[in-house]
């Protein structure tokens, strides 16, 4: 009976147009990005409409598109606050309209498919999670969200017989991290690159060029002003350089000692060391003595 229901649900969802599937994938990616942006655990619980015993103090870790056996869990969230440790396995279903009609065939098939996925993922975590001493409660949640506003329309927590596993936080986080989709992780955490503007885009642009022409005129005026200022500053620098060079030369000339050239053979007249004045006195005395002796008569005696 269950196999017949599963087959019918697959057929109903397979007949949906490709546009609906693409819109659903985009809504999933937007919800992942919004969850990754939150820094406080209380805002995450509010966005998902999930109740937690200590929403403000809980530590959260998110993993997206985790492959658990034959199933892929949309989101797995680990929360720990003291001794209360919960592993939320979240399955997202999106709707085009904001009004949820669970009686329709599409909503019934979405609900039954989501419950089957949650049952398989919970069993896989219970059987293949790494062993540890900490007790973790595995809590499956089915959430219906609007594609446009990402508002929660319906939430359901099914009860399965197995919902407790013994593991550790580090081991379980490594186990989920290794099984998460790498491409989805890059799309969520990496920022989009800015678009490059090529030359042919500017040729096809229909915007007016009045603003650009006015801007070009302003640029030319500024260039002229800059050129005149540069000339003025260069002239002022030349003047200051000339003045400084003249001052340096004058200082160097004053600092040099003035030395008169003297020949070794010649002697200075007024230099006492060489006896210039003494020679003059000797000559005068000699002449005066001769004059004195000339005044007195010389006696000549013949023997």
Swiss-Prot record:
Intracellular or extracellular location(s): Virion; Host cytoplasm; Host nucleus, Host nucleolus; Host Golgi apparatus
Database matches in Pfam families: Herpes_UL24 (PF01646)
Region span, Disordered: 235-280
Annotated GO CC locations: host cell Golgi apparatus; host cell nucleolus; virion component
Induction: Expressed late in the infection cycle.
Composition-biased stretches (Basic and acidic residues): 235-249
Keyword hit for Lyase: no
Location, primary (coarse class): virion
Biased composition (Basic residues): 257-277
Superkingdom assignment: Viruses
UniProt entry keywords in alphabetical sequence: Host cytoplasm, Host Golgi apparatus, Host nucleus, Late protein, Virion
Keyword field contains Lyase: no
Intrachain disulfide bonds: none
Function in brief: May participate in nuclear egress of viral particles. Plays a role in the dispersal of several host nucleolar proteins including NCL/nucleolin and NPM1. Since deletion of host NCL/nucleolin negatively impact on nuclear egress, UL24 supposedly acts on this process through its effect on host nucleoli.
Similarity remark: Belongs to the herpesviridae UL24 family.
The name this protein goes by in its record: Protein UL24 homolog
Gene: 20
